[in-house]
Amino acid sequence: MQKDILAVIGGMGSGKSTVLHLLREQFHYETIEMDRLAKDCYKDRAFLSALRAFLPKKVFQEDGDLAFDAFRSLLLSNCTYRKKVETLVHPMVYRKTEERIHLARQEGGKLAVETALPNKAFLSLADAVLFVEAPMPIRIARLVDKRGYTEREAREMIEAQHIEEYRDCADFVLQNAGDVERVKDALCQFIQRI
C-alpha cells in the first residue's frame, strides 16, 4: 500500500523544517506546517475577539492584533492561559489539516504534515509517522539562532511540549543533529520502507 500521507512530528528545534524541505524537494510531497496554520488563526478577527474575552489587554496591540512577544511570554509563564488558548486554536488547526488531508487523498497526492503538537486523532489520519529528534543542546541553539529566543525561553518551550510521549507512535525515528546528507539518507531509508 502506498503511504501518501505522512505525519512529521518532533519537538521545537528538532529539525522538522529541514525534513519537510527535503520531502518537498527530493520526494515531491506537498507540505503543511501546522504552526503556520495556527499563526493564520491569530490573524483572524473572530478568533482574536475570542482571545480578548479572557486574555489580559497587555498581550494586544492598540490595533487589536496580538503583541506576539507579550503573548508568548504569557503562555510560557501561565499554563492556565496556555491551555485556554490551545482549546481554541488546536481544533481550528486540526480541522484545516484534516480538510487538506482529505483533499490530498481525493486527488491522489502526497502530503507531509508537520506538527510539534500531535494528538492520537491526527496521527490516525496519517499513513505513516516520522518522528524527528535532535539532542537538546542543538535544539536550544537552533531556537536561539533562528527564532531569537533566549536559552531559557527555548528550554521552557521545549519542556512544555511533552512530544517524546509520541515517539513510540512513530514508524521511523530520524536523528537530525544537523548533517543534511545524513538526514537525506535517513529519509531515503524511510521512504523505501513505507
Residue ranges, per PLM feature:
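Small-molecule kinase domains that catalyze NTP-dependent phosphoryl transfer to phosphate-bearing small molecules
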Residues: 124-125, 145-194
